[in-house]
Amino acid sequence: MTEHETRRRFIGATGALMIAALAGCTGDGDDEGGSDGMDNESMDDEGGSDGMDDGSMDDESMDDESMDDKSMEHGATTFTVRIENVSSTDFYGADTATGGQIWITPGAYAVHTGENPLYTEGEAASVGMEALAEAGPPTGFDGEPGLVDELDGAMQVVSSGAYTPANTVADPNDPMEAVPGAPPIAPGGAFEFDIEAEPEQRLSFASMFVPSNDLFLSPDAEGIALFDDGTPVEGDVTGSVVLLDAGTEPNGQPGVGPDQAPAQDAPDQGADEGGVVRRLEAVDDGFEYPAVDATVQVTLTPQ
């Protein structure tokens, strides 16, 4: 599946300020004939009885059938993924670049096996992740590959794409260039997009946290489980999401620093930090940030 085969929708907040095969054992009809000889032989050789043998065989067959049915009960499932900005409208001061709000930019997603393919804690961010974390666009800086490009064809990535305004209808009051490359969602806004996945596959995504120099929201290293013992997961999965520092620019005071989206004059204008991706909780920059579950809510709805 490519990004062009995946439906994405943007749900703007009403009144929100937006500055930006069935498988199983069927049997073969041997229950009625020829079984006496097998049972008698079993009795002679093993000292068992017809009832015990039949029961054991039936129980084992039923167990096998149940396991087969359970493992094959769900094939590919379509999920609607909703990423909602649940932050307060005045977390930062009204005189900050976002008017006190926290914004979440459009981003890139991947359905994958194995670990989250968008980043690795303790390693340098990719070129595409740097662009997203510093300025918001999942399509990258001009002339450089974006995160969407990096995910396309990557090992263990089953499908990938971007949830961007190019495929949506944005709020008419939303300034389209609030974050270079793509507008963000303000408190109360949400993105929705559909993915298709099979058991053992997981979901990861990344969106920039605004205002910041290079912070982003993404699931942890494992990604978000889409199935629980073969059953599609439904409901709130925000507990798998973390706030990370890309390590590409030094952090400034949120909403005040001149090298941050949306205040910066151009993307990638801040100094290079040369660091590695870390959870924000491990970065002692002295600034205040909201808890993840007070910033974003991520839900899954299987179709």
What are these regions (language model features)?
Residues 198-212:
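Short, surface-exposed ligand- or partner-binding patches at beta-edge/loop junctions that are enriched
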Residues 1-80, 84-91, 95-176, 180, ...:
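Terminal disorder- and signal-encoded targeting elements
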Residues 184-185:
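Short proline/glycine- and polar residue-rich coil/turn motifs
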Residues 196-201, 227-231:
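A short, structured loop/turn motif at beta-sheet edges
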Residues 210, 219-232:
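Extracytoplasmic/secretory-pathway segments with low complexity and glycosylation-like composition
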Residues 189-193:
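Short strand-edge motifs at loop-to-beta-strand transitions and within beta-strands
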